[in-house]
């Protein structure tokens, strides 16, 4: 006999369905379910007296006969392509299906087969997102990986060799020897990783040897001399070898102005780091680059969002990170030239307009590695409060804004760095790098982090308790982060040249190496929900920023969500 549930009871049992709305943590952001892949009355759920039992929701199908390794049931997927309710099937470490799970022998419309070999993860009442991608990493210490993983980041791209002065300031792993050592170090770290070689050179040979050693991209940094000549050579090498170039431009305008740097690009694609400028770049108008069709602009998280404390903390950060001396007036002037209220305020609005495409950390080098996701949603919330609903929103929800902001740390850095074939969204065929959140903790504290289908991190209670939940609950590495499972739960991204040169055998690597692909054929138009190219103007005296003639300014936030309500310290 059929039984009708009211919406509240249904949501409590199986999670929200079409038309239901969910608040994201303590923000003003509201999402609404757009589609539900289930068949009402045939939902699957694990537990005592529930559906996933032998002969009911669990079939007799073996793995060879199509049963999945893991099913995530009734999850609310939040991704750039939609906000939908679905079951998710995982097999061989990849997402194999998004749809309806169950037993095809007794249930209709089943496209994810549950069998005796299937593990179940309860997605009811929880949000599922793709693992985040942080594409601006200074590899200063390996402990960054743990903090990032616990925050929901599953891929980290950047450069460095440890706490050397070169790494503290620049995201470069210079030379084949250091690249080999970092790839070997990555063998023991449960994170997808990729390493940028140093891109500052006026001849190509020193850059090409780094790509043959497995660098997944090149980084131009002003502390190594980002001259027009170095820019041109680096981009020429990248065009030949199909890798991305990231750039930190010339704050002091010693070798040219922003117009000279733009000319040196010659229309070629480039990832512009901290395009607002507080993290470095042509003062005061590097922000103009977000209007260029070939420039893929990102922010680093210390300026996200603009608050009453943003300016005060930046000066000291900058002095430390760039090896400056407060006793030298020129060093102080260099630091002060980068910190501008007007451009930081404009950055908030440019993110909301989709003119800034990505957000990353700048880990331990004027950025916080565990706060990429938090700062992204704090920015989205601040803009909702200050600017209201986006014009393209339909209904009483913020779906379009949420899709825009989640793309900034998932699909867009994946596209930018040639890894979107593997990661960056909840999509069939991609690695099962997935994050589950309770709505009340969305963006700030994940429940589970899966790496290639294996749980690698979780909020876990006392291991000596009789159940998993007693205090103290804190993040702990799970089985996917240990032993031989680790090298099957994470990958490293390298150049095709490195793969062709058999660096796995040369360096004794066990992690899967995947080549970056398609880095040179993309542009701003490929940045999902973040492809705007406004005409940018910056007043050199007042630093006022205009986009398409409109002054961009906003007040600093005095209170933020996802902050002290969730943390003791």
Swiss-Prot record:
Substrate binds at residue 221. InterPro entries: Amidohydro-rel, Metal-dep_hydrolase_composite, Metal_Hydrolase, Urease_alpha_N_dom, Urease_alpha_subunit, Urease_AS, Urease_asu, Urease_asu_c. Binds 2 nickel ions per subunit. It is found in: Cytoplasm. Pathway: Nitrogen metabolism; urea degradation; CO(2) and NH(3) from urea (urease route): step 1/1. One of its GO terms (molecular function) is urease activity. The active site is at residue 322. Carboxylation allows a single lysine to coordinate two nickel ions. Its EC number is 3.5.1.5. NCBIfam families: PRK13206.1, PRK13207.1, urease_alph. Belongs to the metallo-dependent hydrolases superfamily. Urease alpha subunit family. This is Urease subunit alpha. It comes from Magnetococcus marinus (strain ATCC BAA-1437 / JCM 17883 / MC-1).
């Amino acid at each position: 006999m059929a039984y009708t549930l009211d919406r509240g009871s249904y949501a409590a049992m199986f999670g929200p369905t079409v038309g239901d709305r969910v608040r994201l943590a303590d923000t003003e952001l509201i999402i609404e379910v757009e589609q539900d892949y289930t068949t009402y009355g045939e939902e699957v759920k694990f537990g005592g007296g529930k559906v996933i039992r032998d002969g009911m929701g669990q079939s007799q199908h073996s793995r060879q006969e199509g049963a999945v390794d893991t099913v995530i049931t009734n999850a609310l997927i939040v991704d750039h392509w939609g906000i939908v309710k679905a079951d998710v099937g995982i097999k061989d470490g990849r997402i194999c299906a998004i749809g309806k799970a169950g037993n095809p022998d007794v249930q209709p419309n089943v496209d994810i087969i549950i069998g005796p070999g299937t593990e179940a993860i309860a997605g009811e009442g929880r949000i599922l997102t793709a693992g985040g991608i942080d594409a601006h990493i200074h590899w200063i210490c390996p402990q960054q990986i743990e903090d990032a993983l616990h925050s929901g980041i599953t891929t980290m791209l950047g450069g460095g060799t440890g706490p050397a002065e070169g790494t503290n300031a620049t995201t470069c792993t210079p030379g084949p020897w250091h690249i080999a050592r970092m790839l070997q170090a990555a063998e023991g770290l449960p994170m997808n990783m990729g390493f940028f070689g140093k891109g500052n050179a006026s001849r190509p040979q020193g850059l090409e040897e780094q790509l043959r050693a497995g660098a997944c991209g090149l980084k131009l940094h002003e502390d190594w001399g980002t001259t027009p000549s170095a820019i041109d050579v680096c981009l020429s090498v990248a065009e030949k070898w199909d890798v991305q170039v990231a750039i930190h431009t010339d704050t002091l305008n010693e070798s040219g102005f922003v117009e000279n740097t733009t000319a040196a690009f010659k229309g070629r694609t480039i990832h512009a780091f901290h395009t607002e400028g507080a993290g470095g770049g042509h003062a005061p108008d590097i922000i103009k680059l977000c209007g260029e069709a070939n420039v893929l602009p990102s922010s680093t998280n210390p300026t996200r969002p603009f608050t009453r404390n943003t300016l005060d903390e930046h000066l000291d950060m900058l002095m430390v990170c760039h090896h400056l001396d407060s006793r030298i007036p020129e060093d102080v002037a260099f630091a002060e030239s980068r910190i501008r209220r007007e451009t930081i305020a404009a950055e908030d609005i440019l993110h909301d307009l989709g003119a800034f495409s990505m957000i990353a950390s700048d880990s331990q080098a004027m950025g916080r590695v565990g706060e990429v996701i938090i700062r992204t949603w704090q920015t989205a919330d601040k803009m909702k409060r200050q600017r209201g609903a986006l014009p393209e929103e339909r209904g009483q929800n913020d779906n379009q804004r949420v899709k825009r902001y989640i793309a900034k740390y998932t699909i867009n850095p994946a596209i930018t760095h040639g890894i979107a074939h593997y990661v960056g969204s909840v999509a069939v065929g991609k690695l099962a790098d997935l994050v589950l959140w309770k709505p009340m903790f969305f963006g700030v504290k994940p429940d589970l982090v899966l790496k290639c289908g294996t749980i690698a991190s979780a909020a876990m209670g006392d291991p000596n308790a009789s159940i998993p939940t007693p205090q103290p609950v804190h993040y702990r590495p799970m089985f996917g982060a240990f032993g031989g499972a680790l090298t099957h739960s994470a990958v490293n991204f390298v150049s095709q040249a490195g793969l062709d040169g058999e660096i796995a055998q040369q360096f004794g690597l066990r992690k899967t190496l995947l080549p970056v692909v398609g880095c040179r054929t993309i542009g701003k138009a490929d940045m999902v929900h973040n492809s705007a190219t406004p005409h940018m103007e910056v007043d050199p005296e007042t630093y006022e920023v205009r986009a398409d003639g409109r002054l961009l300014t906003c007040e600093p936030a005095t209170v933020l969500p996802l902050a002290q309500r969730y943390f003791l310290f």
